[in-house]
Amino acid sequence: MAVVPIRIVGDPVLHTPTSPVPVGADGSLPADLPELIATMYETMDAAHGVGLAANQIGYGLRLFVYDCADDRRKAAHRRGVVINPVLETSEIPENMPDPDNDDEGCLSVPGESFPTGRATWARVTGLDAEGNPVELEGSGLFARMLQHETGHLDGYLYLDCLIGRHARSAKRAVKSHGWGVPGLSWLPGEGPDPFGH
């Protein structure tokens, strides 16, 4: 269990759909999964993230951890893990996202954020760390996180959801940082925090 590097946009593992976590006939999960989950929590916490998908640290498995409020202004957070999540959402708006209310960032695009259109409500079903069924739903920031993390597991970054001038700004930012190529990562807690925490 340790803080590990987070892959940056351009790494193939971020752009490849993940594989389901194997579940035994008796409902058992892989014996090494608790160690991976602990590493994911520790890395997410060190990065001050609200969620972290396994492929962001190089594991092509379908699970994410989260520590997220329902609303940006609320102090109470929900924390947990979802294994093999299935996502359901309300309709995603087709209009331009609001720069004040729809801003979104990503640990794999460190220090950047862009307005991103997302459904206002989302639900995921899957398994918890013990292999028990879990269902999470929410609106606002929590719904945004559920969509963001499940998108990672499907091989997409939030940059892939951007439209118009926001998409163009993101492409310029990726190019200016020298991202978009394999092998780049950053280690939370080492050097300046790209998000200013």
Swiss-Prot record:
Pfam families: Pep_deformylase. CDD domains: Pep_deformylase (cd00487). GO terms for biological process: co-translational protein modification; translation. Its cofactor is Fe(2+). The active site is at E149. It comes from the Bacteria. The keyword DNA damage does not apply. It catalyses: N-terminal N-formyl-L-methionyl-[peptide] + H2O = N-terminal L-methionyl-[peptide] + formate. It is an enzyme of class 3 (hydrolase). One of its GO terms (molecular function) is metal ion binding. Keywords: Hydrolase, Iron, Metal-binding, Protein biosynthesis. Binds 1 Fe(2+) ion. InterPro entries: Peptide_deformylase, Peptide_deformylase_sf. Its EC number is 3.5.1.88. Fe cation binds at C106, H148, H152. Belongs to the polypeptide deformylase family. NCBIfam families: PRK00150.1-3 (NF001159), PRK12846.1-4 (NF009483). Removes the formyl group from the N-terminal Met of newly synthesized proteins. Requires at least a dipeptide for an efficient rate of reaction. N-terminal L-methionine is a prerequisite for activity but the enzyme has broad specificity at other positions. This is Peptide deformylase.
